[in-house]
Amino acid sequence: MTWFGPRLDPDHADLAAMLDSLTTKDIVLEDDSTSIRRLVTELAALGVWTLGTTETSGGGGADDTMTCVALERIARAWPALAWASVQVHAAIDVLAAAGAGAGLVEDLHQGRRAVAVVEADAAHVNLAWDGDVLRGSVSRVDAAHERPHLLVLAGTGTALLIRPDDLDVQPVSRTGLAGALTRSVTVAADRRSVVLVDGVDTSAARARLLRGAAAGAAGIAGAAADGARRYASERRQFGGPLTEIPMVRQTLLDQSNGAASAIAVAWAASSEPSSHAAARRACDDAVDVAASAVQSHGGYGYLTEYAAERHLRDAISLRAAVAIPSSSIRAGAALVGTRPATHPLARTP
């Protein structure tokens, strides 16, 4: 598998090689909870499921660049798992910093439980206090689990953790991202069962989500570009491989440029505003590269026997799952140093 990003140091290269040996097993995920759980458990056993969380919380303590490499490699084969891992990272950051949910944090590290992380004021989130009961709905969560916990980032410094028992979940159809086990969620949670996590760095959690989304999108773009180049090298037309045609080579170069752009912005992101920009750019790059890769396969690009059409569907669904437009308001406020007002959900009855 091609690495389209900056030169890797030996530790990063070893991690990429290890994950390549795992992801090249040609395991195509479906919405089968047993196979998903098996892969998550394997990633957890390898220490990469929560690689970027702090050692004090039980994680791998890897820096952002090492985590970026891991997520990009995982997303080449299983982007739904990469996105689920990103949400687990963000949730552990929040919960461990506040000393909340110690048992849940341990289970998240081991892949035994899952969590969906959403923004309280996102367009697909509709939650409000009704007396002592938190009610409402989230139209989409993608946690690679049938019954995840729900962590709601509510304004600055506050998050709410909701148990699976207080959630009614229903399957949701989507374009791609197989293995995400996408669900809609109806919430009816008594105040006493909602864990209010206060005094935490929710801006850092948002940056973690967006930065991880960018790395996942870069993985999709890289896989699509590699697939198109491989097909063009093997497919013979007019007496030789397609790569002998200058226009084909230029198209492949454009795809590689898009993959390189995606990983470059993911690699460089740090703050909430820069991570928002990275996620937006990388998700768009992934869709563009994957769409071009389908065209590079000709009519075969639309057949499920080839991965090209799956990469395009995955890119589209990841961009929808990340909800880039909803994060732009807070990223803009963070950019200019504006402190948002206390979110209504943070004002518990």
What positions do the PLM features span?
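C-terminal helix-coil-helix/basic helical segment that borders enzyme active sites and/or dimer interfaces
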Residues: 24-34, 229, 233, 237-240, ...
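Short glycine/serine- and small hydrophobic-enriched flexible loop segments
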Residues: 69-76, 93-99, 223-227, 267, ...
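Amphipathic, small/basic residue-rich leader segments at the start of a protein or domain
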Residues: 1-84, 335-349
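Glycine-rich phosphate/cofactor-binding loops in nucleotide/flavin-utilizing enzymes
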Residues: 2-5, 297-349
